[in-house]
Amino acid sequence: MTRKLAAYAAGLMACSSFTAPAFAQDSEDQATPTPPRDDNVIIVTATRRAQDVQDIPIAVTAISPQALENQGVDNIQEVATLAPSFTSSQAQLASGSVVLRIRGVGTTSNNIGFESAVGIFIDGAYQSRPGVALSEFVDIERVEVLRGPQGTLFGRNTSAGALNITTKRADVNEFEGFVNASYGSFEEISVQGAVNVPIVQDTLALRVTGAWRQRDGFLDVVDRTGTVIGDTNDVDQYLVRAQLGWDTESGVRGRLIADYSKSKSSCCGAIELFQSPLVTGGAYAAVGLGLNGGNGQSVVATTPFDQTTFEEALDNRTVSANFAPVADIDNWGITGELEFPISDSADLIFIGSYRKYESFENYDSDFTDLDIFNVDALELELETWTAELRLQGEGAEGRLNYVLGGYFSDESIDQSVSFALGSEYDENVGALLFVPTGGALGPTPLELFTGIDPAGTSNTNRFQQSAQSYSVFGNVSYELVEGLELTLGARYSWEEKDGGFTQTAVNNQICPATLGALGFIPAALQPSFIGLGCFGFTAPADLPQSAVLPLVRTFQSEFSDEELIYTARIGYAFADPVNIYASFTHGYKAGGINLDTTAAVGGADPTFLSEEVDAYEIGVKSRFLDDAVTLNLAAFYEEFTNFQVLEFTGTAFQTFNVPVARSSGLEIESAIRPTDELTFNASATILDARYPEDCAGTSTAVTVLSLCGNKLTNAADVVAIFGGLWEKPLTDSVEFFLSGQIRLESDQRTSTQAIVPPGAAQIAAAGSVQAAIDAAPLIIADVQDGKEFINLRTGLRFNDGQFAIEGFVNNLTDNVVRGVTFNTTLRGSGAANSRSAFSLQPRTYGVTVRAKF
């Protein structure tokens, strides 16, 4: 499918009739009819100046509110339907496992100490984690996907790119608003609305926005017999946002925004794709855990690389667990923006924000109906302050534009996780040890050697961190000669973090007892007994034996760093509709502290290094045929050093830096409007994002060396989007419309590792680490086959869009795909590990009614 998609994408360059970024409606007033072509632009602030997206010399996908509406985009994850270089995936946690990627680059989540490589900014305020920004998309003025490192102007952690989201401003002139209501599959009900009220005409206004959405889960939860006991991956959330905006005759303008969102959605269930040979070989049955090893799914592959059955398991939409996951999230914040003119050509702008994010989650962490290992409570409190002050203006009769400023953020993290071993934990240990011992240890090996049943073992691990970031920055653009503009920018950033891991409650007798019984356990089995008797998530910390054995240790660590981030860019306007540019950017993403129980095992340093990137880009932006056709091209090469990686092995989260990773490719965005009624758009990203063969540098770590030569996760070689919009007036007051779009994705990897990293025995047998890696088997169920995703929406609009009724279907062909595939917890090892995956949403359909006033 990759070759087919590459042909599609290459055809974009040859066929201007199917090329360019979707035509934008005027973002100032989405209620008005389509304006004349000369006004058919999106004004963006990607350079911290309001400019036509076609005039700025950077790669940015600008999405209008009408485009969001036509595609039914409800949150940041669904922006991928409109931007081929952007992808999103989600793993287990509602609060912290969303991964955003731009140009194939992103930071794997599930560790609260990790920050995203894609920065998210809402109304100019930095959102410290993607999960914080997952609330409902409603009353949005525009979304900008800034591709490539953006750290010079956009604050923190934008080594891959940024999402710049702007909500609709309060209008000081008009009373207006809207109400939308939808009903769809899985009993989904959604209501959105906003009202804008001028308080002091032309000076002060209040805008209140709200949204509520509820939907049943699209995955059934079954017990070990296959009986349905519930569902998961549902939606139950609401949002309220109030905005006070002012605009005075003196030029002072600003707004104060307060928002609160609540989510009680169940997220997220994992489908077992491949069943461990320990199950099919009878080890689980031999210890009394049943022929299916506690997995009640009716479909699961039992032979490696059975792609057909992997797909059938996904299509079956069933997960096996003791109970459906529970999440309860409160998210609220305040953002203030003040623009103060200090002269006719310069403004002082302040943006400050405070946000508090609190969550409670409870889930079955072994992903089967066996009672092995649960997270009884995961409680997170995330508090963030940000402040930015900018002086920006122009000089030299408009040839000079500048931005100077300073930025500060202060973040505190407090996460407590209560883990518990279940009533069948020891039997699961018996199954894991059945093959190497020939079943000689019976069904309960831990109790056999210690006299203690591990059931009920529990503890509470607490992770805390405080982080401060400071920076000063400047960006200057100067028109050297007519049409030729040079831009130079720099930011100097300081990062400080202080955090660690402690235990606040421990009820664990099995670990000390296991260590005390090591003298009675055969030497070959001792590492397994240590790992299972002192399971990393539930083991007591700082036991005396931790000085010589790989046991959990508490830690308190500090991280500090500083970096100069800089960019140079030159752009030339051949004529009004054609602009070319070339740029170089040195970007940065701060390192930090691995907030995990195993981070300091063996005296390891729990910190990880900062990530840096050098990015080169050339591009052209053009409009022609009286602005009926738009065609943008961008070619890029990005080289990352100390690329940050987090991997879940099935028993622990490993955090490390890979010395080198690269992303290069070509991006195409295009649109054509042959008539006032028809608009076609097409875009594509042709990508090569990978760890090069020499990615390890001087590192000898197996986890690093085993990545070299493989593609990055969720980095499809080709993603192409084709769409169209037909708006046909039927009478003076009635308009028919039909909107359709298809997103094509080639094959892509869904795991961190592409092979099964060799252990000490394999390395010794092979004679070297590299020889063992070369001989290692591919990891099972890593590659997701290429797919297509088709969205359609049609309906009638009345009275110039004042009222509308619409029908929609998303994912028409019902392709259920996986974004993340991983080793199932405590269910085998190496090539004998079970493999599970988190799936994305299936086909949905429904109706929407809209009213504007």
Model region roles, listed by residue range:
Residues 1-81, 251, 334, 340, ...:
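N-terminal Sec signal peptide and the immediately downstream disordered periplasmic leader
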Residues 35-174, 618:
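Acidic, small-polar-rich N-terminal luminal/periplasmic segments of exported/outer-membrane proteins
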Residues 115-117, 129, 138-147, 152-240, ...:
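Outer-membrane beta-barrel translocator/receptor signature
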Residues 245-247, 391, 401, 405-409, ...:
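Structural signature of Gram-negative outer-membrane beta-barrels, strongest in the C-terminal barrel
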Residues 426, 743-762, 796-853:
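C-terminal beta-signal and adjacent terminal beta-strands/loops
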